[in-house]
């Protein structure tokens, strides 16, 4: 399949192998992730989905020092391992499965803090960005009158939307999302899915999910991983209506999980 010209690809992953303690966790992964798209990575637990996600902004280096990477991962044509990790993570934001706001900071400061840490000091600009991001994730009307309250007082779903707002505050080019709705209620899950589809007009989104139905609802492109290997990838329509591999078909219809 053609995923667009190389200049349009956010990530170009070629023959990627990842070893932790000499054990192969990812094996021969080759994928292109186009810009301004939603790219879904699905597969059963232990298939390497979250590990692949953490490679894309080099968080894997924080989680485990005994790693070895073979192959290439290009970010807008540049080797990610030749890019300063802090700069890369500013441009490639991440939202985790477990909502992780700074619990002892206020709702406002959860977004303001990273802005200040990256050199934005003007209060008026910070206030503007905070409001913009809260509006974008649909939280503003729910929290505008208690911005100084601790983030820990929010519900789990609200906390997850706050962490998305925090990630968006730094204006990333890519947002990585690792099972972002698996631990929250259905109302907030639906709000986040709607947000994801809206955000692709601005940035690329890579979402990991063990839920094929969710991937089918939101993704433009899909990769199916199994036991650390890429089974196949293509457009969402191709993967869900005419998969080339029998294993993919079994996963999509729920015969393996």
From Swiss-Prot:
Keywords: ATP-binding, Cell membrane, Membrane, Nucleotide-binding, Phosphate transport, Translocase, Transport. The complex is composed of two ATP-binding proteins (PstB), two transmembrane proteins (PstC and PstA) and a solute-binding protein (PstS). ATP binds at residues 43-50. One of its GO terms (biological process) is phosphate ion transmembrane transport. One of its GO terms (cellular component) is plasma membrane. This is Phosphate import ATP-binding protein PstB. Signal peptide: none annotated. PROSITE patterns: ABC_TRANSPORTER_1 (PS00211), ABC_TRANSPORTER_2 (PS50893), PSTB (PS51238). Its EC number is 7.3.2.1. Residues 11-252 form the ABC transporter domain. CDD domains: ABC_PstB_phosphate_transporter. It comes from the Archaea. Belongs to the ABC transporter superfamily. Phosphate importer (TC 3.A.1.7) family. Pfam families: ABC_tran. It is a peripheral membrane protein. InterPro entries: AAA+_ATPase (IPR003593), ABC_transporter-like_ATP-bd (IPR003439), ABC_transporter-like_CS (IPR017871), P-loop_NTPase (IPR027417), PstB-like (IPR005670). It catalyses: phosphate(out) + ATP + H2O = ADP + 2 phosphate(in) + H(+). GO terms for molecular function: ATP binding; ATP hydrolysis activity; ATPase-coupled phosphate ion transmembrane transporter activity. PANTHER family: ABC TRANSPORTER I FAMILY MEMBER 17 (PTHR43423:SF1). Part of the ABC transporter complex PstSACB involved in phosphate import. Responsible for energy coupling to the transport system. It is an enzyme of class 7 (translocase). The gene is pstB. It is found in: Cell membrane.
